Each structure stands twice: as C-alpha cells, then as structure tokens.
C-alpha cells in the first residue's frame, strides 16, 4: 500500500513560519525526523520526499502552487502514483480552533479553508483523512487574511512547537497502526 501525507502552506521565504504554513511546518518536522529530504518536482508543482515505513511507501508532499490551488498538485500526485484518496492525509491550519489544538478527522467539508476546498474540488471527494492544527481567530479588527499570513508571536510559537511534536507522534502512530480511528482515539481530546 502507498500513502501520501500532504502539508498545506504557501511557498517562498515570505510565508515561512506564518500561521497558514503550519501544515508545511508539520511535514518538514516529519521528514527531518525520518532523515529524508524533499525534491522539487516541477511537473507536479510540489516538493516531494518519500520513505518506506512498515513495508509501505509513504510520500510526503508540500504543494508549491500556493494554498488556493493545492488540489492541482494533490490530484496529479494521487493519479501518477495510483494512490487512493483513502490513503491521503492532509495537514493544515484551522482558525476556528485554539492555537496549538490538534484534531484528526476522517472526512468533512472544507470549513472555509481554501486549500481544502481546492483539494475537494480537484479529487472529487471530501473523504480523506486530515490533521487540523489550531491557529486561533484574528484579534478584534484584524482581517482573516492578515491573521493567517501573519507570524506567530513568541508565546504562540512555543505552543505551536508543542502541537507540531504531537502531530509528529500522531502521524507516526497512524503509520504504525494503519488506522485513522485508533489514531483519533489516541490523539483527539
């Protein structure tokens, strides 16, 4: 079986460490811990790394299409590697959750997230696994765009690093157990 784990974010140094890029941060941490590296694949508009874990090929992906077009890269890679949507996991930010809270889900709507909207539109289903990382709501008077494209303050970055450690553990547990249900029971709460 082959699986694909996608972290959502925006490419380029301008967006590094922004709230909208916690999906990229999570996948970066996973590949670092596994001692693998990304290769830019211009045909698929993505950075792709891979490893064998428990006799399964796992692709780690960071689309380079910008958030709102993430589905282009995801669909192209799923098709090329013949990966089922049931073997897709997407990690992304959620502004309706408190900073640093994580939640795993099996399926669901985009919830207003443009990267998830793009993936659903391109792959034709909402039925794929997700890990949401809370980035909190904008403060009074701040636009959503300025909030998600803003960087974490020092205290929130500490909280996010703890959350990224938890996401790392959750993904590794998921890859060992091969069960989103067990992973949800273990890490949602």
From Swiss-Prot:
What are the EC numbers? 3.1.1.29
Cell location = Cytoplasm
InterPro entries associated with the record: Pept_tRNA_hydro, Pept_tRNA_hydro_CS, Pept_tRNA_hydro_sf
If you read the UniProt record, what top EC class would you report for this enzyme, in one word? hydrolase
Entry keyword set: Cytoplasm, Hydrolase, RNA-binding, tRNA-binding
What the record says about family reads: Belongs to the PTH family.
Instruction: Summarize subunit and interaction data from the UniProt record for this chain.
Output: Monomer.
* Protein name (database record): Peptidyl-tRNA hydrolase
* Organism lineage string: Bacteria, Bacillati, Bacillota, Bacilli, Lactobacillales
Protein's gene: pth
